[in-house]
UniProtKB/Swiss-Prot annotation:
Protein known as: Tripartite motif-containing protein 10
Consequence of gene disruption: Deletion mice inhibit hypertrophic remodeling after transverse aortic constriction surgery.
Zinc finger (B box-type): 94-135
PROSITE patterns with a match to the protein in the record: B302_SPRY (PS50188), ZF_BBOX (PS50119), ZF_RING_1 (PS00518), ZF_RING_2 (PS50089)
GO biological process terms on file: erythrocyte differentiation; host-mediated suppression of symbiont invasion; innate immune response
Tissue spec. comment: Expressed in embryonic liver.
InterPro entries: B30.2/SPRY, B30.2/SPRY_sf, Butyrophylin_SPRY, ConA-like_dom_sf, PRY, SPRY_dom, TRIM/RBCC, Znf_B-box
Family: Belongs to the TRIM/RBCC family.
Transferase in keyword set: no
Residues reported in the UniProt entry to bind Zn(2+): C99, H102, C121, H127
Source organism (scientific name): Mus musculus (Mouse)
Length: 489
């Protein structure tokens, strides 16, 4: 059996040039072209410049006489066979392009009624005064409208997709932040639980010691008191027995007896020694470290939940040529050898500094810096305004839009209007920098000992970037994730 495409191709070969439908009662004119009898008859009835004796072929424009066309029975049989093939190839399937009223193939479209028409529908009076066009011609303007709609819809779809992608990324960031805060809460409470357990054990041990000392002194007191009671009981019994005697018996050795009574000193032992009593009174002082630790815990927990860890990396476009950056842009080392770096407007050319790639325009952020200084080296840590000068000499001070501290070999300085050397208990090797943009605080803390280093107060109106500086062969620094250091704001 012929396939559907081949049958369709055959059917196209037996279409009427006038109605574009399958030939009905095909007739042939003088030039040899074939038409539907009805189509050709109506064509001949159309008034025109041609004479009634001669008309021109609708296809080749060759003249023919109106009454000269003759039936083409052979072609009619071919059309009939092709229609049988079409019916066989589409049996069991709904013919979508057939007129439901007349069963004819649909070729036309009525603009006013928005109806699809076959040849018979077109010839009826219902659509006679309407604009009727071939399907493809009518579909053209609608295709253009569809294309315009598609452009708008695709653009809106892309915007929605971009919004979805952006919001999903934001959600992932928020989920990461929640997971980080959850871990911080678990970590801090685990630390607190361990500390409380240790404190409980220590305090209970001290109470156990006090309890043992009290029982020991009670035993000693009871022993001493019992001895005194026995001695007094013996003397009382002796006096009572002597008092029962006759006058002669009473007066015998009376002086010696009375002297023993009068010279007898009553020892009144103390149940609790003053030293033990003082230890009991001083016991509440043992809870002072616990109170301090609880205060530190609350400060630490509130800080970690309030400040967002800033996962920053170094910007190679701003790095001074003497700074060697690692591939992950999280470490830097000083070198006297200049790197072959392009002299861009963003790069520092005098001060050996580098900025972070991302800055802040609001919020609370914190980051860690590990410092490894060689002898005579120094490291500068802080923040700068976005418009900080990159070329020429630059004094690191707030007037220049720089708030930083310098860690040198053996001392630390706050780089204010005039550098101030700070008195610290320990030289920091790991510094936590905390930025509160809205309040205007930049705080530096020794991340190991929790010792407060320095706090700047400023008013920010521009984007703020983390700043790092190095000097001295062998000196280096690296950025690390926050590990729960607390800032004493």
């Amino acid at each position: 059996m012929a396939s559907a495409p081949s049958v369709t191709s055959l059917a196209d070969e037996v279409n009427c040039p006038i109605c574009q439908g399958t030939l009905r009662e095909p007739v042939t004119i003088d030039c040899g072209h074939n038409f539907c009898r009805g189509c050709l008859t109506r064509y001949c009835e159309i008034p025109g410049p041609e004479s009634e004796e001669s008309l021109s072929c609708p296809l080749c424009k060759e003249p023919f006489r109106p009454g000269s066309f003759r039936p083409n029975w052979q072609l009619a049989n071919v059309v009939e066979n092709i229609e049988r093939l079409q019916l066989a190839s589409t049996r069991g399937l709904e013919v979508e392009d057939a007129c439901p009223e007349h069963g004819e193939k649909i070729y036309f479209f009525c603009e006013e009624d928005e109806a699809q028409l076959c040849v018979v529908c077109r010839e009826t009076g219902q659509h006679g005064a309407h604009t009727v066009r071939f399907l493809e011609d009518a579909a053209g303007p609608y295709r253009e409208q569809i294309q315009k709609c598609l452009v708008c819809l695709r653009k809106e779809r892309e915007e929605i997709q971009e919004t979805q992608s952006r919001e999903n990324k934001r959600i992932q960031v928020l989920l990461t932040q929640v997971a980080t805060k959850r871990q911080q809460v678990i970590s801090q409470f685990a630390h607190l639980s361990q500390f409380l357990q240790q404190q409980q054990t220590a305090l209970l041990a001290q109470l156990e010691g006090l309890d043992g000392d009290i029982l020991k002194q009670q035993e000693e007191f009871d022993s001493l008191a019992t001895g005194e009671i026995c001695r007094f009981s013996t003397l009382i019994e002796e006096l009572e027995e002597k008092n029962k005697r006759t006058a002669r018996g009473l007066l015998t050795d009376i002086r010696s007896t009375l002297i023993r009574c009068e010279t007898r000193k009553c020892r009144k032992p103390e149940a609790i020694s003053p030293e033990l009593g003082q230890r009991i009174r001083d016991f509440p002082q043992q809870a002072i470290p616990l109170r301090q630790e609880m205060k530190t815990f609350l400060e630490k927990l509130c800080f970690e939940l309030d400040y967002e860890p800033a996962h920053i990396s170094l910007d190679p476009q701003t790095s001074h040529p003497k700074l060697l950056l690692s591939e992950d842009h999280r470490r830097a080392r000083f070198s006297y050898k200049w790197q072959n770096s392009p002299d861009t407007p963003q790069r520092f050319d005098r001060v050996t500094c580098v900025l972070a790639q991302c800055g802040f325009t609001g919020g609370r952020h914190t980051w860690m810096v590990n410092v490894d200084l060689a002898h005579g080296g120094s490291c500068t840590v802080g923040v700068v305004r976005e418009d900080v000068r990159r070329k020429g000499e630059l004094r690191l001070r707030p007037e220049e839009g720089i708030w930083a501290v310098r860690l040198a070999w053996g001392f630390v300085s706050a780089l204010g209007s005039f550098p101030t050397r700070l008195a610290l208990e320990e030289q920091p090797r790991k510094v936590q920098v905390s930025l509160d943009y809205e309040v205007g605080w930049i705080t530096f803390v020794n991340a190991v000992t929790q010792e407060h280093i320095y706090t700047f107060t400023a008013s920010f109106t521009q984007k703020i970037f983390p700043l790092f500086g190095l000097w001295g062969r062998g000196s280096s620094f690296s950025l690390s994730c926050q590990e729960g250091a607390v800032s004493l704001l």
